[in-house]
């Protein structure tokens, strides 16, 4: 797809919209660590249960990565990110209303699915809408946003807990996600590939898997990221 470089002011605002979504993704990813004492008391959870809650997020997140690539190429970040974030709202509200460990776990999986496009969606858009000299900077800033989400999942959440409780914190997050969806639908550009026909032959997963360089990076990514998590 040909580049469609956006004016700098519009590009900055688009980055802000995408960054808000990725911030929420990071916040939801790490928040269970802060809430673990409360969840343990309220639901009589074990250490294994808490581990499963963290793993449920990654299960939902990872399960979407392969279909996500096709969906982003075909429909673009605007439709995909906003659609997936609707699932995140469902998962967040379900977590806030959960009455059992199974309810918490299912909600975490839904949240993982819902925020799974919050990084790859923006990176797909930046590739087309941002000039080459801004690509590395935009990627680095997205990682900074990730760290900010982790930070806000600690002390700010602890400050809010005695004020509104953990269930209402998730309700507030659901409202923030809804605002991000509206901003995405209003301001993210339309994906040019949507108006093209199906004559162009797209690559298959077998093409990717048959690439020797790709296969050589799998162990590095698997153990390196797994160790970090």
Regions found by a protein language model. Give the residues of each.
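Juxtamembrane intracellular "pre-TM" segments in multi-pass secondary transporters
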Residues: 2-7, 191-218
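Extracytoplasmic
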Residues: 14-45
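Residue-level signature of mid-helix packing/kink "hotspots" within the transmembrane helices
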Residues: 30, 58-66, 150-151
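Conserved MFS/SLC helix-loop-helix module at the cytosolic interface between two early adjacent transmembrane helices
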Residues: 63-99
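Paired small-residue
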Residues: 91, 102-110
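Cytoplasmic helix-loop-helix junction between adjacent transmembrane helices
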Residues: 107-145
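Helix-loop-helix hairpin linking two adjacent transmembrane segments in secondary transporters
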Residues: 141-188
